[in-house]
Amino acid sequence: MSSGLYLYGIFPDPIPETVTLQGLDSQLVYSQIIDGFTFLYSEAKQEKYLASRRNLISHEKVLEQAMHAGFRTLLPLRFGLVVKNWETVVTQLLQPYKAQLRELFQKLAGRREVSVKIFWDSKAELQAMMDSHQDLKQKRDQMEGKALSMEEVIHIGQLIESNLLSRKESIIQVFFDELKPLADEVIESDPMTEDMIYNAAFLIPWENESIFSQQVESIDHKFDERLRIRYNNFTAPYTFAQIS
């Protein structure tokens, strides 16, 4: 029994039936054209989908396969979007946001989103920082085994935090300075873990990805094995397809 329509994304061009895609619940994916917008959808077998790894991957895979098939300009829709009928899409999405959707298509045409996440070893960085600031290390060592006042504890903690922040910012600045000129737009997000120090998405010309990738690798070499970099060069443009 159908629970409605599960929506994956919106495209500016029709997608022929020869493009065969499989979505959530192993359902075939179809396209529906409304007022010049092509929606990829499948029959929803559930009213609400659990954001499990399997379901998230299935959702993303539909969009990525469409991109591989040559339909690179798209507006990905959030995971779990189920509507009862197309009238809901018209009244709640197209009528109020039609102009903004078309502006987003223009912005994304010929461009792709890539993301860079940078990780460091916080314990190793702390030790390296202390080794390079002998005065701070000596001050910390002198306090070991002593009964410290709250003010002393706060003071030494602030000094350590400030120096670690400076190390972190110097790394981030290198990446930003060398990658920003290659991008049309950059959106920085909060780090997701304690060891993640930078999390950013870049909107770049589609054909320039290899240049961007080489630059990321070049920066990585500058820091030797100090950092771990997670670079994603093929994803739907979730970060840059936001309706304001």
From Swiss-Prot:
The keyword Transferase does not apply. Keywords: Gas vesicle. Its main location: other. It is found in: Gas vesicle. It comes from the Bacteria. Pfam families: GvpL_GvpF. GO terms for cellular component: gas vesicle. GO terms for biological process: gas vesicle organization. A minor component of the gas vesicle, may be involved in preventing GvpA aggregation during gas vesicle nucleation. Gas vesicles (GV) are hollow, gas filled proteinaceous nanostructures. During planktonic growth they allow positioning of the organism at a favorable depth for light or nutrient acquisition. Has 2 domains with the C-terminal tail tucked between them. The C-terminus adopts a modified ferredoxin fold. PANTHER family: PROTEIN GVPL 2. Belongs to the gas vesicle GvpF/GvpL family. Binds GvpA. This is Gas vesicle protein F. It comes from Nostoc sp. (strain PCC 7120 / SAG 25.82 / UTEX 2576). The lineage of its organism: Bacteria, Bacillati, Cyanobacteriota, Cyanophyceae, Nostocales.
